[in-house]
Amino acid sequence: MDMYVIGLQEVNSKIINFLSDLAFDDPWSIFFMTVFSPLGYIKLSSVRMQGLLLLVFVKHAHIPFIRDIHTHYTRTGLYGYWGNKGGVTIRMSLYGHMICFMNCHLPAHIENAEQRLDDFEKILEMQQFEDENVPNILDHDILFWFGDLNFRIADYGIHFVRESISNSRYNLLWEKDQLNMAKKKEAFLQEFIEGPLQFKPTYKFDLHSDVYDTRGQKTLFWFNGKKRKPAWTDRILWRVKNLSQHSSEDGDLSEGEQTISVTLNNYISHMSYGISDHKPVTGTFGLQIKPLFSTPLVTLNPEGEWNAAQDVLISYSTVSEFPSSTWDWIGLYQVTFRHVNDYVTYAWVKDDEISSSEDVTQVYISADEIPHAGGEFLLCYYSHNMQSIAGMSQPFQIQPSRRSAEKELAQENINGIEKPHSPKPYDEF
């Protein structure tokens, strides 16, 4: 897997938690970084609006080829003044192709289907990016739209819906799914593709169970005894710009001279999770793209053997069109680093420069900044103008300092001291 995109809704947004999460990484981000960083992924970007959270994790190998990373959010709750509902997006250029991920939480309740569509259109209209070629969400080559879209199953009664689910006859419910119904009428929705709903409706469940809602609906002052009708509220759709008309019914795009296409490999829910009244949904996609460039903007390497006994050198070179800045810097990272600010130390490319030629520039890092314990590390060049990593070195070893090595050896000797051997009954003499 090359990339993980995670959209959460209804994350704890109490004011104390929210303010704390603004200053520090929220618990969900920390959890996912703890899982993914040992596997060679870093958090490329994230955006949060109250209870909506969107995270993108990417394999190291792709980082130098991802550019123009921007985030956006749109509030639609309380007439646009409150962010309990709305959409958050992360867009980027991946090997030269513009891709956008949009996580939405749309209005609830079966009678609000039109409001859901209105809010989605509002999000599409209001989110503008500072890019002449790709200013709007629908201008991106690929758009993934997902989240708690809150569309319900219309017309059918709760008993028919539950009976159809019990018999795994989900197809009986598809034509009355409000999103499917809207796609038949709304032209802009017809450009979006979704895999078949071959899993149970993902809402509403009793907590910590796979049993559909057994409690009455809570109104302003009391429970009215009416139970929620199951629905596919949690969805993943995608749109390929100007290619939707070439899509086959199973979601694959027709072959030809296309430089980019999307294939859905699976689309499933996960019934074992019970911390919410929704069941999470995942989609696994194959993204076939023809790279518009294959050379990183910056190539950098550590010079010689690195240890904490001496200053160390970094050599780097850039392509001619690279928009360098005096605010660019090179970070030293452990190979399991979590995000771009998770560096051990860094050097300013201008202030710490010691030599420069037409082809190669060298900067130094003081010996005092080098980790004494050593280990496996890598270097990343961060571009201020691009607000992203423009180059990454191969992993390399930093040798432990003599002091660190002696300390480790002494500890091993202490751990190696054993009690005198007591012969076992059958030891031979």
Regions found by a protein language model. Give the residues of each.
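Short amphipathic alpha-helices and their capping/turn segments at secondary-structure boundaries
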Residues: M1, T89-R91, V134
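N-terminal, active-site-proximal structural segment of metallo-dependent hydrolase catalytic domains
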Residues: M1-S46, L52-L54, N112, F120-L124, ...
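Catalytic lobes of large eukaryotic enzymes
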Residues: T34-L39, M102-P107, E111-K407
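Acidic, serine/threonine- and proline-rich intrinsically disordered appendage/tail regions
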Residues: S401-F429
